[in-house]
Swiss-Prot record:
GO terms for cellular component: cytosolic large ribosomal subunit. Residues 145-158 have a biased composition (Polar residues). This is Large ribosomal subunit protein uL15. GO terms for biological process: translation. PANTHER family: 50S RIBOSOMAL PROTEIN L15, LARGE RIBOSOMAL SUBUNIT PROTEIN UL15M. Part of the 50S ribosomal subunit. It comes from Crocosphaera subtropica (strain ATCC 51142 / BH68). Pfam families: Ribosomal_L27A (PF00828). InterPro entries: Ribosomal_uL15 (IPR030878), Ribosomal_uL15/eL18 (IPR021131), Ribosomal_uL15/eL18_sf (IPR036227), Ribosomal_uL15_bac-type (IPR005749), Ribosomal_uL15_CS (IPR001196). PROSITE patterns: RIBOSOMAL_L15. Binds to the 23S rRNA.
Length: 158
């Protein structure tokens, strides 16, 4: 057997239909385009979404703005200025702040923000610190212990 002797299997191919070659051919006269109108003329026709001059649906419908985050991270926040009321060399955690009454509701892990001035040396234990908060706590003679556990966090490679 040679390459020029290879043919498709019998019944596997179908002849293409010749459009517009007479009424008896089956697809003659208007060639499957119906009667008159823009869709039967030559050319590409209308663009997708065109409604004949009527205001199209995608312009009639109000657009959704400000999509919410899928997995927003919520933090219980406190500014360093509020920590001045604590006694010196105290260990500050989310639980201790709730006991003292500086924080009333637990909205998630503690995040320390840098608004205000700090004069008392404190040991602050929290998962998140802003850079200014960290600088103010350390300049007051205190220390920051980062509790964020990155060992169990999912990586992008998995």
């Amino acid at each position: 057997m040679r390459i020029h002797e290879v043919n498709p299997q019998k019944g596997s191919t179908k002849r293409r239909r010749r459009i517009g070659r007479g009424i008896s051919a089956g697809q003659g006269a208007s060639g499957g385009f119906g009667m008159r109108g823009q869709k039967s003329r030559s050319g590409t026709g209308t663009k997708a979404g065109f409604e004949g001059g009527q205001m199209p649906l995608y312009r009639r419908v109000p657009k959704l703005k400000h999509f919410p985050l899928v997995n927003p991270s919520h933090y219980t926040i406190i500014n360093v200025g509020k920590l001045n009321s604590l006694s010196p060399n105290t260990e500050v955690t989310l639980e201790s702040l709730m006991e003292v009454g500086l924080i009333t509701s637990n909205d998630g892990p503690l995040k320390v923000l840098g608004n205000g001035e700090l004069t008392v040396p404190l040991t602050v234990r929290a998962p998140k610190f802003t850079a200014s908060a960290k600088a103010k706590i350390e300049s007051a003679g205190g220390s920051c212990q980062d509790l964020s556990d990155t060992s169990n966090a999912p990586s992008n490679n998995e």
